[in-house]
Curated annotation (Swiss-Prot):
This is Adenine phosphoribosyltransferase. GO terms for cellular component: cytoplasm. CDD domains: PRTases_typeI. InterPro entries: Ade_phspho_trans, PRibTrfase_dom, PRTase-like, UPRTase/APRTase. It comes from Lachnoclostridium phytofermentans (strain ATCC 700394 / DSM 18823 / ISDg). Pathway: Purine metabolism; AMP biosynthesis via salvage pathway; AMP from adenine: step 1/1. Keywords: Cytoplasm, Glycosyltransferase, Purine salvage, Transferase. One of its GO terms (biological process) is purine ribonucleoside salvage. It is an enzyme of class 2 (transferase).
Amino acid sequence: MKKLEEYVRSIPDFPEEGIIFRDVTSVLQDKDSLKMSIDQMQENLNGLDFDVIVGPESRGFIFGVPIAYNLNKAFIPVRKKGKLPCETVEMEYALEYGTATIEMHKDSIKPGQKVVIIDDLIATGGTIEAITKLIEQLGGEVVKIVFLMELEGLMGREKLKGYDIASVIKYAGK
Protein backbone atom coordinates (compact mmCIF):
# COMPACT_ATOMS: atom_id res chain seq x y z
CA MET A 1 0.00 0.00 0.00
CA LYS A 2 1.22 3.51 -0.83
CA LYS A 3 2.23 5.93 1.90
CA LEU A 4 -0.11 8.88 2.36
CA GLU A 5 2.43 11.45 1.14
CA GLU A 6 2.62 9.58 -2.18
CA TYR A 7 -1.00 10.58 -2.87
CA VAL A 8 -0.31 14.32 -2.48
CA ARG A 9 0.19 15.89 -5.89
CA SER A 10 3.09 18.37 -5.96
CA ILE A 11 2.84 21.11 -8.58
CA PRO A 12 6.05 23.09 -9.18
CA ASP A 13 5.99 26.87 -9.75
CA PHE A 14 2.35 27.33 -8.66
CA PRO A 15 0.99 29.86 -7.85
CA GLU A 16 4.35 31.50 -8.59
CA GLU A 17 7.85 30.47 -9.59
CA GLY A 18 9.85 28.75 -6.86
CA ILE A 19 6.77 27.49 -4.97
CA ILE A 20 5.78 23.82 -4.86
CA PHE A 21 2.00 23.65 -4.41
CA ARG A 22 0.87 20.66 -2.33
CA ASP A 23 -2.53 19.67 -3.73
CA VAL A 24 -4.84 18.02 -1.19
CA THR A 25 -7.51 17.30 -3.84
CA SER A 26 -5.50 14.30 -5.04
CA VAL A 27 -5.82 12.85 -1.51
CA LEU A 28 -9.59 13.43 -1.52
CA GLN A 29 -10.09 11.84 -4.94
CA ASP A 30 -8.83 8.43 -3.86
CA LYS A 31 -10.85 6.37 -1.36
CA ASP A 32 -7.77 4.78 0.21
CA SER A 33 -5.90 8.04 0.77
CA LEU A 34 -9.04 9.81 2.01
CA LYS A 35 -9.58 7.12 4.64
CA MET A 36 -5.87 7.05 5.49
CA SER A 37 -5.73 10.84 5.94
CA ILE A 38 -8.75 10.93 8.27
CA ASP A 39 -7.53 7.91 10.25
CA GLN A 40 -4.00 9.28 10.67
CA MET A 41 -5.22 12.73 11.72
CA GLN A 42 -7.64 11.12 14.19
CA GLU A 43 -4.86 8.96 15.70
CA ASN A 44 -3.34 12.19 17.06
CA LEU A 45 -6.38 12.52 19.33
CA ASN A 46 -6.12 9.08 20.97
CA GLY A 47 -6.48 9.44 24.74
CA LEU A 48 -7.05 13.21 24.56
CA ASP A 49 -9.81 14.71 26.71
CA PHE A 50 -11.74 17.29 24.67
CA ASP A 51 -15.29 18.45 24.00
CA VAL A 52 -15.57 19.82 20.45
CA ILE A 53 -13.76 20.02 17.12
CA VAL A 54 -13.40 23.34 15.30
CA GLY A 55 -12.49 23.57 11.62
CA PRO A 56 -12.08 26.46 9.19
CA GLU A 57 -13.86 26.76 5.87
CA SER A 58 -13.50 24.78 3.69
CA ARG A 59 -10.96 22.01 4.02
CA GLY A 60 -11.15 22.03 7.81
CA PHE A 61 -14.76 20.92 7.26
CA ILE A 62 -13.66 18.05 5.00
CA PHE A 63 -11.39 16.53 7.64
CA GLY A 64 -12.98 17.82 10.85
CA VAL A 65 -16.53 16.57 10.34
CA PRO A 66 -15.68 12.87 9.81
CA ILE A 67 -13.32 12.92 12.79
CA ALA A 68 -15.99 14.59 14.95
CA TYR A 69 -18.50 11.97 13.77
CA ASN A 70 -16.11 9.08 14.48
CA LEU A 71 -15.40 10.37 18.00
CA ASN A 72 -19.00 11.43 18.78
CA LYS A 73 -18.04 15.10 19.18
CA ALA A 74 -19.71 18.28 17.96
CA PHE A 75 -18.19 20.16 15.01
CA ILE A 76 -17.99 23.96 15.07
CA PRO A 77 -17.46 25.70 11.71
CA VAL A 78 -15.31 28.81 11.29
CA ARG A 79 -16.45 30.77 8.25
CA LYS A 80 -15.49 33.77 6.20
CA LYS A 81 -17.21 36.95 7.36
CA GLY A 82 -20.87 37.24 6.41
CA LYS A 83 -21.60 33.52 6.00
CA LEU A 84 -23.10 32.72 9.44
CA PRO A 85 -26.74 33.68 10.17
CA CYS A 86 -26.69 34.34 13.94
CA GLU A 87 -24.71 36.61 16.25
CA THR A 88 -20.99 36.10 15.68
CA VAL A 89 -17.55 37.00 16.96
CA GLU A 90 -14.95 37.84 14.35
CA MET A 91 -11.21 38.19 13.97
CA GLU A 92 -9.24 39.94 11.25
CA TYR A 93 -5.82 38.57 10.33
CA ALA A 94 -3.05 39.38 7.87
CA LEU A 95 -2.65 37.70 4.51
CA GLU A 96 0.35 37.98 2.21
CA TYR A 97 -1.43 40.85 0.43
CA GLY A 98 -4.08 42.43 2.67
CA THR A 99 -6.33 41.01 5.38
CA ALA A 100 -9.17 38.52 5.85
CA THR A 101 -11.85 38.15 8.50
CA ILE A 102 -13.21 34.92 9.95
CA GLU A 103 -16.11 34.41 12.32
CA MET A 104 -17.84 31.90 14.56
CA HIS A 105 -21.27 31.90 16.15
CA LYS A 106 -21.06 33.61 19.52
CA ASP A 107 -22.77 30.65 21.23
CA SER A 108 -20.67 27.93 19.53
CA ILE A 109 -18.04 27.53 22.26
CA LYS A 110 -19.02 27.37 25.92
CA PRO A 111 -16.66 28.70 28.61
CA GLY A 112 -14.35 25.93 29.79
CA GLN A 113 -14.80 23.70 26.74
CA LYS A 114 -11.71 21.88 25.54
CA VAL A 115 -11.27 22.38 21.82
CA VAL A 116 -9.38 20.60 19.04
CA ILE A 117 -8.75 22.47 15.77
CA ILE A 118 -8.53 20.42 12.56
CA ASP A 119 -7.32 21.76 9.20
CA ASP A 120 -5.67 20.46 6.05
CA LEU A 121 -2.53 22.60 6.03
CA ILE A 122 -0.40 24.91 8.13
CA ALA A 123 1.63 27.41 6.14
CA THR A 124 2.19 30.78 7.85
CA GLY A 125 -0.21 29.96 10.71
CA GLY A 126 -2.21 33.19 10.40
CA THR A 127 -5.64 31.62 10.00
CA ILE A 128 -5.19 29.17 12.86
CA GLU A 129 -3.74 31.88 15.11
CA ALA A 130 -6.92 33.93 14.52
CA ILE A 131 -9.08 30.87 15.27
CA THR A 132 -7.26 30.23 18.57
CA LYS A 133 -7.93 33.85 19.57
CA LEU A 134 -11.65 33.50 18.76
CA ILE A 135 -11.93 30.28 20.76
CA GLU A 136 -10.17 31.83 23.75
CA GLN A 137 -12.30 34.99 23.48
CA LEU A 138 -15.35 32.74 23.88
CA GLY A 139 -13.81 31.03 26.93
CA GLY A 140 -12.64 27.83 25.26
CA GLU A 141 -9.27 26.14 25.71
CA VAL A 142 -7.39 24.89 22.65
CA VAL A 143 -5.92 21.53 23.69
CA LYS A 144 -4.66 20.29 20.30
CA ILE A 145 -4.27 21.43 16.69
CA VAL A 146 -4.01 18.76 13.97
CA PHE A 147 -3.04 19.30 10.33
CA LEU A 148 -2.79 16.88 7.46
CA MET A 149 0.19 18.76 5.99
CA GLU A 150 2.75 21.26 7.25
CA LEU A 151 5.00 23.52 5.18
CA GLU A 152 7.82 23.84 7.70
CA GLY A 153 9.70 26.49 5.70
CA LEU A 154 6.89 29.01 6.29
CA MET A 155 7.36 28.82 10.08
CA GLY A 156 3.66 28.58 10.97
CA ARG A 157 4.45 26.83 14.25
CA GLU A 158 6.20 29.99 15.44
CA LYS A 159 2.84 31.81 15.51
CA LEU A 160 1.31 28.95 17.48
CA LYS A 161 3.92 28.53 20.23
CA GLY A 162 2.38 27.15 23.39
CA TYR A 163 -0.12 24.96 21.54
CA ASP A 164 0.11 21.19 21.07
CA ILE A 165 0.44 20.75 17.30
CA ALA A 166 0.52 17.58 15.20
CA SER A 167 1.04 17.26 11.44
CA VAL A 168 0.67 13.98 9.56
CA ILE A 169 2.91 15.01 6.63
CA LYS A 170 5.75 17.54 6.92
CA TYR A 171 7.43 19.27 3.99
CA ALA A 172 10.75 21.01 4.65
CA GLY A 173 10.24 23.81 2.11
CA LYS A 174 7.56 26.37 1.39
